[in-house]
């Protein structure tokens, strides 16, 4: 009872209700229940996973597209989609669909929209363009044309024009053109949702957080066993696994979302979503991350502590070639080097070693491996039970499952063993869809500048070494929801990473100006 009581005390102590705030019950029911079209973007190969997340969240009219899932929902659903989805890159709210066969057509259609409803006086805006069209070959040209139409409307109606802000706009717009079909949307997310907010430092070619979460969700693991990443790098897979195991919303670390700057932003509604911990659950197993690079190990420990999962995750300096059979039921999910961006002296030998360790030291468990080189997979020397195609940036990879059992396959099945579930068979079927869309890969380089934060954002900067003034600017703009240094909940092991600095659980400041602090702590003794 002591540990449970302690956790409840911490949660209750740091939950605040702003004085004088409106009761959600008093808000117009019609406004809250009004549904509209929404689009969640993701990586190629994760659409099915994202659709399942949206369905579980309660979204309506869920339909899968290429690198996106469309759905309908009200304002609460839009807030929840940003805050709770693990596999969404951003959430868009379409405000206009139209056909444009020329630049003049597009300009005229954009001017038809009443922009005074979306961009208030004194507010700034930006436009991102994604273009797949023979007519509109230059995305920057599309961006400028949309911007001109908006600015000209304001100048004609008011005599003044809104300013453009690329780095920190009040309103973010997104236009998507496929041949002559255009969709103009409000970007409700802002910075790409893969930027969770817990990453303090990184290593070369870190795994994108959205892709990591998608990989874990594709395995079906939700915390029922121990989780092992034997080549953990900066710790992305272990941290995303902890979020999934404890059912914690990945948006909890975010400083802000774009919708918080909208004219119709409902602070009370978002506070109720943020403070709702009813779906969080206990995690009775453990997560392990190993790496041979000591710098990666220290970086992973730093990121794990920043996320508040030191009780759930153990990071150690270990070589997988010395891996031995775990005592408890476990799953391995790993992202070994491919040789594309990271130079590995004996790449094929590494994969051969992986297969040998799995075959002799992982009986009775399952392992999932992401790679894109067929010759690497061949060196593993094991037959995968499932192959799921997925893109890692511009690399067309495969995520393969290896069911490790002792003896013959027929004997394993006779004893009730399952090599491939029905859901996994459906995922496998997606491979044929990929083969029909090979041309998409050729377009990725063309769209890199359009969606740098979505598709190719694998470079993260050290806050300490490369941006010494980051902390000052960060706090001047808006206090983060998690603020290191509040207490000693992370323990002495974390202090050693930062010398005299004490990085406790981050303190959350919601509500913009005058907002009271909220705190969330995931590192309690109960875990």
Predicted regions, residues:
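Class I S-adenosyl-L-methionine
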Residues: 130, 155, 176-218
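Basic Arg/Gly/Lys-rich low-complexity intrinsically disordered segments
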Residues: 1-33, 401-527
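Conserved S-adenosyl-L-methionine
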Residues: 207-325, 340, 348
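Short SAM/SAH-binding signature in class I
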Residues: 329-335
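Accessory substrate-recognition/RNA-binding modules or partner subunits associated with SAM-dependent
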Residues: 34-171, 188, 194, 201, ...
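Short glycine/proline-enriched loop/turn "hinge" motifs that connect secondary-structure elements
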Residues: 116-121, 176-177, 326
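Conserved hydrophobic/aromatic beta-strand scaffold that supports enzyme active sites
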Residues: 174, 397-401
